[in-house]
Every structure is written in structure tokens, then in C-alpha cells.
């Protein structure tokens, strides 16, 4: 451990194994707060390497609680957050639309970081039980194509660093781990990053973690596809990485001149999303969700983005997505009651 600390304090990078050892200790509560603060600060000042981030991810994955992983193909869709845009929860709603289209989605979710409402906050507004047992979540996935794994329920190793991270009041390596810590370890993923410079880092981490296929994207300082600018993409397929750019026309849509209005509260977020999922939302919001679903369909092998967008729009406008949300909530109610009665 001493050699690892000396390397960090000398502004030298750790290899993946050294990082794994360090974060195994951190996730076990074996590093004091003052030492942890110095480690995180030193790493932030010199910048964290792909190998260091990969080692940290593997350390937390090895300590996560069990989830019965399916033997069929499934994906996650997640954003890093941190863009401070306070828009509606695009990735969460895209997951529901994709499930309504027949894709299997296991979404790793957490509480809000910089937005007015995180994925778990909006799910609870829709009465989705995030404390469902792993077995119940898996059953919901099998029958309704989707389940949500709440990060604090599966990753209790983070509790040892929460106070230090709060006191530091700055982004650290921890802020970049979440999208890679899905307890089901999916073979597919779509990840949005808040900074264009993070695309290459994220896609190489996915390669290190041996994802089968994945997309990392960024557009207009947000962690999602937008309709008013260029979307920058790096895609991992068969261990090879390709990069390209997309415009709204790539999805068969027109450029929107105005940007999404900021959301001021959880209640406003919920109301807007509810109307969209009922097929009564604005065209801009419908299309914004649809293009993100199109990228999710792509990692499943549906390569035509224009056709993918049409399929997603049809599902959204039919109102079927809202019905699907209600079905998921109702299926999880039984487990919710059982939890409160034990």
C-alpha cells in the first residue's frame, strides 16, 4: 500500500492491478478519511488514467451484491450526469420506450447528483419500487422487458467515501464510475457523457471491461443525443472502436432551433414525462427521446437509425409506454407490500 501511495503523491499513474488493490481497500472502509481525501485530490490534480478507472470499477464490481444475471442479451442506458442542464430524464424514459419495443433493459439508477431529479426520483414518482428483491426484479425483466437496479442497494462500498466526497465539493474519480457499475454486468450499453473529452476514455473502459457492443456519445454539452447540434459518437463492436458524428437528419428528423427548457422541480419533470409517455407530449420531447432510443436499438443490431426512430416515435405516440410503466409498477407492488410486512 505504501508504494501505491508514493506513486500517487509523486504524480505517477497506477496500473490497473494497483488501482484495484487501492479501491478494494477504499470500498472496505480500510482507508482513513484524511488519507482518502489526499488520494482523491492528488489523482484529480494529475488526472485519472483509463487503467486506474478500470481498476476502480473492477474493485467495486467484485464487492457488489448478487443479481441473477440473465442468459439472454440485455442492455443498460445511462448518462454520467454532471451537465447541470436540469432537463427531463431522457435515459430513464428511453429505457421504458425500448422495453415497450421489446428490448431487454436493466437500468442502473441512482439519486440526483446535479439535476433537479435523478432517475430514482422520477421512478418513485411513477410508483416503481426500487427496493424490490433481485429475484423480483429479474422476474419483472423476464416478463416486462425491464427492471431497475438501485445503486445504493447493490453497492454499499460507497458509504465509506461519501463523507469525504461531500466535503471535497469537487468531481473525483468516483463521479465517473457509476455508468460502469451495473450489478447485472450487461454485455451492451449506451452511455452519455457530459464532456466530449470523456468519450474516448469511456469507450476504452468499456473495451477493458469486455463489453460486446457499446456506444458512448455526447452532444451540445449534454450526456444524450440532441436535435439542435452534432452528436459525437464512439462505438465499440467486436473489440474495435469507431468514431463518427450524427446530425438530426441522420435520424430522419429536422434540426430544432430551440433548446429544451430547464426543469424547475421533480413535480414538473414528472408531469411532462407523464404526458409524453401517454402520447400527449410536445413533438420536440417525443423526438428527443426517440433518437436516444434509436441508439439503444442500434447496439442490439438494428442498424437503421431512421427506422429505429420511427419505431420509437410510434410507440411513444400510441400511449403504450405509459401503460407499460403502469404494468411494471403494478408487478412490483406485491414485492413492496411483502417488504413492509416483514
From Swiss-Prot:
Its cofactor is Mg(2+). One of its GO terms (biological process) is L-tryptophan biosynthetic process. One of its GO terms (cellular component) is cytosol. 5-phospho-alpha-D-ribose 1-diphosphate binds at residues 79, 82-83, 87, 89-92, 107-115, 119. Mg(2+) 2 binds at residues 223-224. Anthranilate 2 binds at residue 165. Pathway: Amino-acid biosynthesis; L-tryptophan biosynthesis; L-tryptophan from chorismate: step 2/5. Anthranilate 1 binds at residues 79, 110. Its EC number is 2.4.2.18. Keywords: Amino-acid biosynthesis, Aromatic amino acid biosynthesis, Glycosyltransferase, Magnesium, Metal-binding, Transferase, Tryptophan biosynthesis. GO terms for molecular function: anthranilate phosphoribosyltransferase activity; magnesium ion binding. Mg(2+) 1 binds at residues 91, 224. It comes from the Bacteria. Binds 2 magnesium ions per monomer. It catalyses: N-(5-phospho-beta-D-ribosyl)anthranilate + diphosphate = 5-phospho-alpha-D-ribose 1-diphosphate + anthranilate. Pfam families: Glycos_trans_3N, Glycos_transf_3. Belongs to the anthranilate phosphoribosyltransferase family. Catalyzes the transfer of the phosphoribosyl group of 5-phosphorylribose-1-pyrophosphate (PRPP) to anthranilate to yield N-(5'-phosphoribosyl)-anthranilate (PRA). Homodimer. This is Anthranilate phosphoribosyltransferase. It comes from Buchnera aphidicola subsp. Acyrthosiphon pisum (strain APS).
Amino acid at each position: 500500500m505504501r508504494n501505491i501511495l508514493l506513486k500517487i503523491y509523486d504524480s505517477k499513474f497506477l496500473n490497473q492491478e494497483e488501482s484495484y488493490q487501492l479501491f478494494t481497500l477504499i470500498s472496505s472502509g480500510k482507508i482513513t478519511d484524511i488519507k482518502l481525501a489526499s488520494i482523491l485530490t492528488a489523482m484529480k490534480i494529475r488526472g485519472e488514467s483509463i487503467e486506474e478507472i478500470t481498476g476502480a470499477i473492477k474493485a467495486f464490481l467484485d464487492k457488489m451484491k448478487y443479481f441473477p444475471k440473465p442468459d439472454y442479451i440485455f442492455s443498460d442506458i445511462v448518462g454520467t450526469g454532471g451537465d447541470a442542464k436540469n432537463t427531463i430524464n431522457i435515459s430513464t424514459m428511453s429505457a421504458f420506450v425500448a422495453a415497450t419495443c421489446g428490448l431487454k433493459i436493466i437500468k442502473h439508477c441512482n439519486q440526483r447528483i446535479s439535476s433537479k431529479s435523478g432517475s430514482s426520483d422520477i421512478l418513485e414518482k411513477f410508483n416503481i419500487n426500487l427496493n424490490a428483491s433481485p429475484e423480483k426484479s429479474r422476474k419483472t425483466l423476464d416478463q416486462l422487458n425491464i427492471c431497475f437496479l438501485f445503486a445504493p442497494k447493490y453497492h454499499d462500498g460507497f458509504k465509506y467515501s461519501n463523507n469525504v466526497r461531500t466535503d471535497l465539493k469537487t468531481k473525483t474519480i468516483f463521479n465517473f464510475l457509476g455508468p460502469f457499475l451495473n450489478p447485472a454486468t450487461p454485455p451492451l450499453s449506451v452511455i452519455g457523457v457530459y464532456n466530449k473529452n470523456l468519450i474516448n476514455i469511456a469507450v476504452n473502459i468499456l473495451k477493458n471491461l469486455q463489453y460486446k457492443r457499446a456506444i458512448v456519445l455526447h452532444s451540445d454539452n449534454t450526456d444524450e443525443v440532441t436535435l439542435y447540434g452534432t452528436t459525437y459518437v464512439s462505438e465499440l463492436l467486436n473489440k474495435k472502436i469507431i468514431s463518427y458524428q450524427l446530425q438530426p437528419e441522420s435520424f430522419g428528423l429536422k434540426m430544432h432551433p430551440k433548446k429544451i427548457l430547464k426543469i424547475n422541480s421533480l413535480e414538473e419533470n414528472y408531469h411532462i414525462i407523464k404526458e409524453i409517455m401517454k402520447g400527449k407530449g410536445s413533438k420536440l420531447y417525443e423526438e428527443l427521446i426517440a433518437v436516444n432510443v434509436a441508439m439503444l436499438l442500434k447496439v442490439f443490431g438494428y442498424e437503421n437509425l431512421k427506422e429505429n426512430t420511427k419505431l420509437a416515435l410510434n410507440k411513444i405516440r400510441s400511449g403504450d409506454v405509459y401503460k407499460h410503466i403502469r404494468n411494471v409498477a403494478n408487478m412490483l407492488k406485491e414485492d413492496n407490500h411483502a417488504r413492509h410486512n416483514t
